[in-house]
Amino acid sequence: MSFKKNKYSVLKKAISKELADFVYKYFKNKRNVARVLFDSRYISPFTEYWGIWNDEQVPNTYSHYGDIAMETLLQQVKPVMEKHTGLKLSETYSYARIYKKGDVLARHKDWYSCEISTTLNLGGDDWPIYLDPTGKQGQAGVKVKLNPGDMLIYSGCDLEHWREEFIGKDCGQVFLHYNKVGSKMAKENALDKRPLLGLPAWFKGAKLTNSTK
């Protein structure tokens, strides 16, 4: 399947099943610890570097922008993304979720920071993703099933994508986002405008001091 022709491609075993399982267990542990920290008021409910449960796209589901382990995957997977898309890419950000029973990912297209994206299956119960390779809206779409370690590469700004209601218990996915290198806009948007990968969104536009470079 050609990404250049279809604007999407499925890559089996993009990372090993063992690595996917490690990251999946790590992220579930982080979710559980975060819940205790928030509920005990050990940390502020507005603290985002432990993840959130108030994501508007999938409410009441544990989600995390820029987790350091996921951002490391963002770096590690980039050469694979470049090989299979034929594009030179720059990292923008990662976003991970552990979906729960009843969750739905509504049909949508992405914004510029998600120009070239992948959804990487970390583990849990099966939950296919759908996308419409025609670039139109409201089409039946193509059903894509991923096993742990598999990923779907897609042009997020061009192709509508979604997931229907989840009937399993949980499912761990991480979205890894990139821009095509070459434009002024892409250069300005590098790392989603953060000075370093792994920093929360609060650091967009921030400048590092000499002591932190």
What do the PLM-derived regions correspond to, one by one?
Residues 1-4, 201-206:
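Fe(II)/2-oxoglutarate
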Residues 1-85:
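Non-heme Fe(II)/2-oxoglutarate
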Residues 2-5, 90, 123, 170:
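A short, polar/charged loop/turn motif at coil->beta-strand junctions and beta-hairpin connectors
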Residues 54-60, 73-130:
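Conserved double-stranded beta-helix
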Residues 101-162, 170-174, 179-195:
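Catalytic core of non-heme Fe(II) oxygenases with the double-stranded beta-helix
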Residues 192-204:
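Mobile, glycine-enriched helix-loop/loop "lid" segments at the mouths of ligand-binding/catalytic clefts
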